């Protein structure tokens, strides 16, 4: 065992710059994307600021605006986001730690959440007080006005942004028989139309809470991120008046992806990079070349559109940021092109037989579509067409009050029955980029979301019981449900209409279905004979006592060896499929007496807190293929470990 930890510790300290960068090959089609296709095209020049000499940083960031975001010589800042109060002031909740800390940047796990205030959205922000200990905060406001500041492994809550008293608490999570991918860290939140909250965890799972504080229920059984190679982290989700948006970063490839969704569960990925190093540029074209851009957060306008993105940035590899040196980190603000407000006026669904499409461009303060838009430059349709310069072309315009209606020839729109927000790209008469997404009048933007738990065998009734809940915001459509067990399917059963959050249990005969705890189940939903959803709830979970034993065992190892960083690395590798380790760990497991179960569960809960904190920031570690192979091949055994 000591040899194992020696291997981990040795590989841990071999981290290099090369190990933190991998050149990801872009799809060939991305070479043909037009301006406005990529999310990163929306970044605008940073507002003019103050530049001074004698500051920390590599040569590539000495041209920075020191009054942008938040920066202090003696503090290293990292992730955070901004809320606005009713008086118009901006409140940044950001984490940081002393720059002269013995571990340098690696002191992040002891960071403090600061509350900083500014009269300007871009800063400079000045610290008013501290909220408490914690890392990677994300603040959001509940329906009743209270403010929640999430941090890894918990949250702080207060009556308002200016509160001097913050109460610490912990969220409750129900995985609903689904595997939790990469633990529950770096959570990001978006308020839904009914003031409930949607949450995306670091691993790409989607969760929903009725009010933001009540238990978060997991809906997805796999990550919702793009189906491409990548080491994903730093998700940020938000919702505007039309749709949900999600950006996730591949920290190893230093490329981020942009996704959109009608319901927050089913996502489409747009082509092109969401951001890459170098998106922080000035009006004169000068670039602040930060080594890493992480923990993106957005500030939204009254329509929910992202108008600014904040990043945690550092001028070098994290391991090279040492105490009392020339390196450090800060949080910066970059303005965004918020896009136009668009709506399709066609009442009937757009099909291949549709001849014209009418799109209204709404007037706003500082934007007159009747005089500002270069109509000939506009293209409209599915992002799969418009992002490449294709799509519908305008044929005429009409005036509607202060708004402009553009009539497009429908040919080439690329719009299908799955479309929920067609895209427009063009230019204004000064050559500046215009873009926007249009509301379709026939689309339900508050759909039902049916989700099943793992089927359970009911011995008394001799069948399989399936619990189904509607997590959507509308009543469900007529639906039939089918259960597939180890490849064998059962007859479909009609599901009654479920109101939002309503639960219904269906009973299936067990003639064709197995009741084995290790059986593989799928629950399939059909509407009008067409499959609309397929759930794959995981295998039956081990008992709380077995889980407690596992976590307690690892907790003892952690306390004994005290190799926090190396141990964190090990946990991350094991977490890819933890349940596969249970049989090995339990080979020497002896049934514990009931009276000590409570104590074991208590210890396990304490370790889960350590575990969640430790798996965060995994991008700091180099790959160790040899050790991973040793674990997977069984060369490194865990069966000899006992309490």
Predicted features, each with a name:
Residues 468-472:
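Asparagine-centered strand-capping/turn motif at beta-strand->loop junctions
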Residues 4-13:
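Sec-dependent N-terminal signal peptides
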Residues 349-354, 455-461:
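Short, solvent-exposed loop/linker segments at the N-terminal edge
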Residues 20-343:
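Carbohydrate-active catalytic/glycan-binding domains of CAZyme proteins
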Residues 638-643:
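Conserved small/polar residues in nucleotide/adenosyl-binding loops
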Residues 488-515:
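Intrinsically disordered, low-complexity Pro/Gly/Ser/Thr-rich segments with frequent PxxP/GP/PP motifs
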Residues 513-545:
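Terminal connector regions
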Residues 473-479:
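Short acidic/proline- and small/hydrophobic-mixed sequence motifs that coincide with surface turns
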């Amino acid at each position: 065992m000591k040899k194992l930890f020696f291997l981990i510790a040795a590989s841990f300290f071999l981290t290099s710059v090369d190990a933190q960068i991998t050149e990801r090959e872009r799809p060939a089609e991305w070479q043909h994307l037009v301006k406005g296709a990529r999310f990163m095209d929306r970044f605008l020049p940073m507002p003019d600021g103050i530049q001074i000499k004698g500051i920390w940083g590599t040569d590539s960031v000495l041209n920075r605006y020191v009054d942008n975001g938040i920066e202090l010589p003696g503090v290293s800042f990292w992730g955070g986001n901004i809320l606005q109060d009713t008086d118009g002031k901006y409140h940044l909740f950001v984490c940081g730690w002393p720059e002269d800390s013995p571990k340098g940047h690696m002191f992040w796990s002891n960071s403090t959440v600061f509350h900083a205030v500014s009269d300007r959205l871009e800063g400079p922000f000045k610290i008013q007080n501290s909220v408490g200990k914690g890392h990677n905060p994300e603040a959001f406001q509940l329906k009743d006005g209270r403010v929640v500041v999430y941090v890894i492994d918990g949250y702080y809550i207060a009556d308002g942004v200016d509160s001097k008293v913050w109460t610490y608490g912990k969220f409750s999570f129900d995985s609903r028989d689904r595997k939790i991918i990469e633990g529950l860290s770096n959570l990001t939140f978006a308020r839904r139309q009914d003031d409930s909250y949607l949450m995306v965890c670091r691993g790409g799972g989607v969760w929903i809470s009725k009010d933001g504080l009540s238990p978060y229920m997991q809906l997805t059984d796999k990550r919702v991120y793009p189906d491409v190679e990548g080491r994903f982290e730093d998700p940020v989700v938000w919702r505007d008046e039309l749709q949900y948006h999600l950006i996730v970063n591949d920290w190893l490839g230093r490329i981020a992806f942009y996704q959109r969704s009608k319901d927050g569960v089913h996502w489409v990925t747009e082509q092109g990079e969401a951001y890459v190093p170098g998106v922080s540029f000035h009006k004169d074209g000068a670039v602040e070349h930060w080594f890493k851009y992480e923990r993106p957060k957005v500030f939204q306008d009254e329509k929910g559109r992202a108008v600014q993105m904040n990043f945690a940035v550092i001028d070098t590899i994290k391991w090279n940021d040492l105490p009392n040196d020339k390196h450090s980190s800060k949080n910066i603000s970059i303005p965004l092109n918020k896009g136009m407000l668009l709506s399709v006026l066609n009442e009937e669904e757009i099909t291949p037989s549709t001849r014209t499409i009418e799109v209204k461009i709404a007037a706003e303060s500082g934007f007159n579509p009747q005089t500002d838009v270069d109509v000939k430059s506009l293209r409209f349709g599915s992002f799969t067409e418009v992002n490449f310069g294709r799509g519908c072309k305008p044929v005429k315009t009409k005036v509607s009050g202060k708004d402009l209606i553009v009539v497009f020839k429908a040919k080439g729109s690329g719009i299908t029955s799955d479309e929920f927000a067609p895209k427009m790209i063009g230019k204004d008469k000064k050559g500046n980029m215009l873009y926007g997404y249009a509301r379709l009048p026939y689309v339900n933007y508050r759909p039902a979301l049916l989700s099943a738990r793992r089927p359970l065998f009911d011995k008394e009734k001799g069948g399989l019981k399936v619990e189904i809940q509607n997590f959507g915001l509308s009543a469900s459509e007529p639906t039939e449900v089918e259960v597939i067990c180890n490849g064998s399917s059962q007859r479909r059963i009609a599901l009654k209409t479920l109101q939002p959050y309503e639960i219904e249990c269906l009973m299936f005969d067990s003639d064709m279905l197995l009741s084995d705890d290790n059986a593989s189940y799928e629950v399939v939903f059909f509407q009008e004979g067409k499959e609309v959803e397929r759930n794959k709830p995981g295998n039956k979970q081990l008992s709380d006592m077995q889980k407690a034993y596992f976590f307690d065992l690892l907790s003892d190892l952690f306390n004994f060896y005290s190799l926090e960083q190396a141990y964190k690395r090990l946990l991350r590798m094991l977490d890819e499929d933890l349940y596969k380790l249970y049989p090995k760990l339990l080979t020497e497991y002896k049934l514990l007496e009931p009276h000590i179960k409570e104590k074991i569960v208590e210890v396990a809960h304490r370790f889960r807190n350590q575990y969640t904190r430790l798996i965060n920031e995994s991008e700091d570690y180099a790959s160790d293929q040899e050790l991973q192979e040793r674990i997977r091949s069984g060369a490194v055994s865990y069966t000899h470990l006992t309490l």
